[in-house]
Amino acid sequence: MGSLVVGGLVFLCLSMATSIGLIVRARLPDHHLNAESKDVIRLATAVVGTLSALALGLLIASAKSTYDNAEVEMRTAAARVLLLDRVMAQYGPETDKARQLLRELIAKRLSRGWTAETTDEPSAKALGEYQDIESVQADLRSLAPKDAAQRSLQARALEVSGMVAETHWLLVESGKEGLPWAFLTVLVCWLALLFATFGLQAPVNPTVLSILLVCALSVAGAIFLISDMANPYVGLVHVSDAPLQSAIERLGKP
């Protein structure tokens, strides 16, 4: 589910909860909303409000951690790709085919993005990324080193290629983590309860209604940002692929 859809649904839910509170207020007898009753309602909603604030804070921290980890993984992927290319370049011209395969792998990944749905999707006769990195490793294993230096470079290239494959799948797995939906559902229920009590106690006038709608929009905006950051490779707030864009410009050079 897209982040904008999530934010929109939260806004609708909170707006409906406020409306329900206003409708209930209009139908309740006056003694149900006297000063003592309102004090009890405020005390009860204070508990729910505190829990909601804690839950929202945890979601923000979780989403920010996911986003930061994705940024680190992207830079790590770019560094390992460059390292693999340079190790193969030092080996000699025998690795030209493997270097070209590596460049095609990165170009394909950049064009398809980082979602789990596109990670290994073959098109026509083209291999998916998983097969591509295996092709690079197969070329490296088929090399016939002539001396100790080339044997060392071959072993190092195979080691780094394994790290590149591992990083690729880390990027994919982190890209599909998303939000803990059960946690988010409970949070939205708490927030809806809060906004229902706001409507229950609020006088019906344009100023109060406008403020309540703005508050609902603000909370929905926060949920939208959390949802967007929890999916770091898609959406408005996404991890830049600039490190890999920069890396691909250097691949294949002598």
Model-assigned labels for residue ranges:
Residues M1-G2, V6-L9, S37-A44, Y67-A70:
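Disorder-to-helix initiation segments
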Residues E73-Q90, S240-P254:
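Short extracytoplasmic/periplasmic juxtamembrane "stem" segments immediately C-terminal to an N-terminal membrane anchor
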Residues A70, L83-K176:
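Structured inter-helical modules in multipass membrane proteins
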Residues L28, H32-D39, T76, G128, ...:
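Juxtamembrane loop-helix boundary motifs flanking transmembrane segments in multi-pass membrane proteins
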Residues R42-L59:
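A generic, lipid-embedded transmembrane alpha helix
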Residues S3-P29, V40, V172-P254:
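Alpha-helical transmembrane anchor segments
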Residues L54-R75, A230:
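Transmembrane signal-anchor/signal-peptide helices with a preference for the extracytoplasmic
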